[in-house]
């Protein structure tokens, strides 16, 4: 009886020999996913005006979730660099890619929003009408709440005010609200702290932090970096 029980146990054991490898039947391991391209990839980029160098050569990258500061005196090329990356000017040498596409291409423009000295607001339209116009032209970030964004930038109660009646700082806040509503992953901001008080500077920093936390990125120029917070990933210092 004892030998019978041992035999029964042996029959239940799996049969292994030297020619069997459990890994042989496992599915092949897939290659790791290709990382997405950086939001900005610049290599030896330079620009000159009338044969006089404006900036460069510059090389840098900006990844999702990063904020990069461009710092420099007036005339150092901060605005020119942003215009080159937006596809409004052609560089003299080097290369730049915006999410893997050429600056100014349809693919790049679809993923990019800019804010400069000219805010592009319609003075005869109300604050709310300006925001709705921006969303109609350029789309809207998923889940965006216009009233919540107005409150975030300190314009709660100003939705029905014509933009022409606002102060310079309130107009800047309106443009910031429009920016926050857009679906663009990359922000190019030229002097966003101009015409803002301490509270307005805090609004800019809060919007930048939220945008970076959501996987976006921003390239920000600032004269003297006034008010710029500590979340900056790196700083480009341009010399006049």
Predicted regions and their residues:
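Hydrophobic anchor residue at the start of the ABC signature
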Residues: 176, 215
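Conserved ABC ATPase signature
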Residues: 162-166
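Helix-to-loop junction immediately C-terminal to a conserved catalytic motif
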Residues: 86
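Conserved ABC ATPase "signature" region
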Residues: 132, 143-158
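Q-loop/switch helix immediately C-terminal to the Walker
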Residues: 118, 123-139
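Catalytic Walker B motif of ABC-type/P-loop ATPase nucleotide-binding domains
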Residues: 187-191
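Conserved ABC transporter NBD signature motif
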Residues: 94-110
């Amino acid at each position: 009886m004892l030998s019978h029980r041992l035999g029964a146990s042996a029959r239940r054991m799996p049969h292994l020999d030297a020619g069997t490898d459990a890994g042989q039947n496992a599915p092949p391991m897939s290659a790791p996913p290709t990382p997405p391209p950086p939001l900005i990839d610049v290599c030896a980029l330079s620009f000159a005006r009338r044969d006089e160098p404006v900036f460069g050569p510059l090389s840098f990258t900006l990844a999702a979730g990063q904020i990069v500061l461009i710092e420099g005196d007036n005339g150092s090329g901060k605005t020119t660099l942003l215009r080159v990356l937006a596809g409004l000017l052609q560089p003299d040498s080097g290369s730049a890619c915006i999410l893997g596409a050429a600056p100014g291409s349809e693919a790049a423009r679809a993923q990019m929003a800019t804010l400069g000295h000219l805010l592009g607001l319609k003075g005869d339209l109300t604050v709310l009408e300006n925001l709705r116009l921006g969303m109609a032209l350029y789309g809207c970030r998923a889940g965006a709440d216009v009233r919540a964004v107005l409150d975030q930038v300190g314009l709660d109660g100003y939705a029905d005010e014509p933009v022409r009646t606002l102060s310079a700082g309130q107009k800047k806040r309106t443009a910031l609200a429009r920016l926050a509503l857009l679906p663009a992953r990359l922000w190019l901001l030229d002097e966003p702290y101009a015409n803002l008080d301490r509270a307005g500077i805090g609004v800019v920093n809060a919007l930048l932090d939220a945008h970076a936390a959501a996987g976006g990125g921003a390239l920000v120029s600032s004269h003297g970096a006034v008010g710029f917070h500590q979340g900056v990933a790196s700083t480009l210092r341009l010399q006049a």
